[in-house]
Amino acid sequence: MAGTTAGYIGHHLTFLSSGEGFWAVHLDTLFFSIVSALIFLFVFRNVAKKATSGVPGKLQCMVEIVVEWINGIVKENFHGPRNVVAPLALTIFCWVFIMNAIDLIPVDFLPQLAGLFGIHYLRAVPTADISATLGMSLCVFALILFYTVKSKGFGGLVKEYTLHPFNHWTLVPVNFILETVTLLAKPISLAFRLFGNMYAGELIFILIAVMYSANAAIAALGIPLHLAWAIFHILIITLQAFIFMMLTVVYLSIAYNKAEH
């Protein structure tokens, strides 16, 4: 662990990676995103296996509330077949929420635990890594194109990006540029919104942790600040998971809507 404040912050913001440059793989991001997915699958699978028609347990009630809530959102906003979109929305919300929630674990706990196994760098919050959020948003981007082609055909896709908003052949280049920028803005905004909020939240936790190494008065101030930020951060991690899920559903609805253009 680095001895200076700058070194401490830099240490906590360094990924456990393999390779260099563009091709570097952030192993910690990969590991914790997979663990988060397994937690989601384990919980929902167990609830589904133990579901009863009688009085449900607390966990079953919570899962049923989340499933019905998200199914209602999809039903209200997506007017096509929901056999894929509804499970996708549920997966996105729960997966992103679990990954975000890792940020509530004390910032030194997991890195120090990893240090016992000879791992010197570890960042545990996958959604504070732009490569992870971009990866998820690119998957959404691919689904947008898929649902556009599915509902309008390839010819409809071409028309959508060449004859809108100006329906004249002389303005095809202008239409193409405008629609391409609009299309690319969707995954980019999805990725950077989630990344920016979670990175800022992680950094604030690190800065508060720095206070504990100062004098007793500042260290004592850090305790209520840490608690207050953790409570507020619960709202942030939930809201960001909801926004990512909601925008995905809206974007897919726009792509599928045959009467859109």
Curated annotation (Swiss-Prot):
Q: Which Pfam families match?
A: ATP-synt_A (PF00119)
- For the keyword Zinc, the answer is no
Does the keyword Membrane belong to this entry?
Answer: yes
Its membrane topology: Multi-pass membrane protein
- Give the transmembrane region(s): 24-44, 85-105, 129-149, 203-225, 239-259
Give the subcellular location. Answer: Cell inner membrane
Q: Which InterPro entries does the record associate with it?
A: ATP_syn_F0_a_bact/chloroplast, ATP_synth_F0_asu, ATP_synth_F0_asu_AS, F0_ATP_A_sf
Superkingdom:
Bacteria
- Report the main location listed first in the record: membrane
Keyword annotations: ATP synthesis, Cell inner membrane, Cell membrane, CF(0), Hydrogen ion transport, Ion transport, Membrane, Transmembrane, Transmembrane helix, Transport
A single Gene Ontology CC annotation of this entry is: proton-transporting ATP synthase complex
Which GO BP terms apply? proton motive force-driven plasma membrane ATP synthesis
| GO molecular function terms listed in the Swiss-Prot or TrEMBL record | proton-transporting ATP synthase activity, rotational mechanism
Listed under subunit, the entry gives: F-type ATPases have 2 components, CF(1) - the catalytic core - and CF(0) - the membrane proton channel. CF(1) has five subunits: alpha(3), beta(3), gamma(1), delta(1), epsilon(1). CF(0) has three main subunits: a(1), b(2) and c(9-12). The alpha and beta chains form an alternating ring which encloses part of the gamma chain. CF(1) is attached to CF(0) by a central stalk formed by the gamma and epsilon chains, while a peripheral stalk is formed by the delta and b chains.
Give a short account of what the protein does.
Key component of the proton channel; it plays a direct role in the translocation of protons across the membrane.
Q: Which PANTHER family match?
A: ATP SYNTHASE SUBUNIT A, CHLOROPLASTIC
The entry's family comment says: Belongs to the ATPase A chain family.
Report the protein name in the record: ATP synthase subunit a
